[in-house]
């Protein structure tokens, strides 16, 4: 195995996880903040807002998991070797 390919794969795996978690992290923070603001404005709609928030957080977290899958594929099932 070429050491240059191995090193590039490790760097790419780190970048995949790092960059894949930036967007969803910002989105989750914004969504949670807006949900808290909405519940503060309309306390009677707490259940509906919370349900929608949890569903949207799950979809956002899926993007991070996709980045982790790409990183694991680069680490253990390297297609470039």
From Swiss-Prot:
Superkingdom classification of source: Eukaryota
Segments passing through the bilayer: 3-23, 53-73
Major location category of this protein: plastid
One cellular-component annotation, GO: proton-transporting ATP synthase complex
Keywords: ATP synthesis, CF(0), Chloroplast, Hydrogen ion transport, Ion transport, Lipid-binding, Membrane, Plastid, Thylakoid, Transmembrane, Transmembrane helix, Transport
UniProt keyword annotation of Oxidoreductase present: no
Membrane-protein topology: Multi-pass membrane protein
InterPro entries, per the entry: ATP_synth_csu_bac/chlpt, ATP_synth_F0_csu, ATP_synth_F0_csu_DDCD_BS, ATP_synth_F0_csu_sf, ATPase_proteolipid_c-like_dom, F/V-ATP_Csub_sf
Gene3D superfamilies: F1F0 ATP synthase subunit C (1.20.20.10)
Gene Ontology MF terms: lipid binding; proton-transporting ATP synthase activity, rotational mechanism
Compartments (UniProt record): Plastid, Chloroplast thylakoid membrane
A Pfam family that the UniProt record links to this protein: ATP-synt_C
Record-marked site positions (Reversibly protonated during proton transport): 61
Family the UniProt entry places it in: Belongs to the ATPase C chain family.
Its job: F(1)F(0) ATP synthase produces ATP from ADP in the presence of a proton or sodium gradient. F-type ATPases consist of two structural domains, F(1) containing the extramembraneous catalytic core and F(0) containing the membrane proton channel, linked together by a central stalk and a peripheral stalk. During catalysis, ATP synthesis in the catalytic domain of F(1) is coupled via a rotary mechanism of the central stalk subunits to proton translocation.
HAMAP family named in the record: ATP_synth_c_bact
Oligomeric form and interacting partners: F-type ATPases have 2 components, F(1) - the catalytic core - and F(0) - the membrane proton channel. F(1) has five subunits: alpha(3), beta(3), gamma(1), delta(1), epsilon(1). F(0) has four main subunits: a(1), b(1), b'(1) and c(10-14). The alpha and beta chains form an alternating ring which encloses part of the gamma chain. F(1) is attached to F(0) by a central stalk formed by the gamma and epsilon chains, while a peripheral stalk is formed by the delta, b and b' chains.
More info: In plastids the F-type ATPase is also known as CF(1)CF(0).
Protein name: ATP synthase subunit c, chloroplastic
Higher taxonomy: Eukaryota, Viridiplantae, Streptophyta, Embryophyta, Tracheophyta
Gene: atpH
């Amino acid at each position: 195995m070429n050491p240059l390919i191995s090193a590039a794969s490790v760097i790419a795996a780190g970048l995949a996880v790092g960059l894949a978690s930036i967007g969803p992290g910002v989105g989750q923070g914004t969504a949670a903040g807006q949900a808290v603001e909405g519940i503060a404005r309309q306390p009677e709609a707490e259940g509906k807002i919370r349900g929608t928030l949890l569903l949207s957080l799950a979809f956002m977290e899926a993007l991070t998991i996709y980045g982790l899958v790409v990183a694991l594929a680069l680490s253990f099932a390297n297609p470039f070797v």
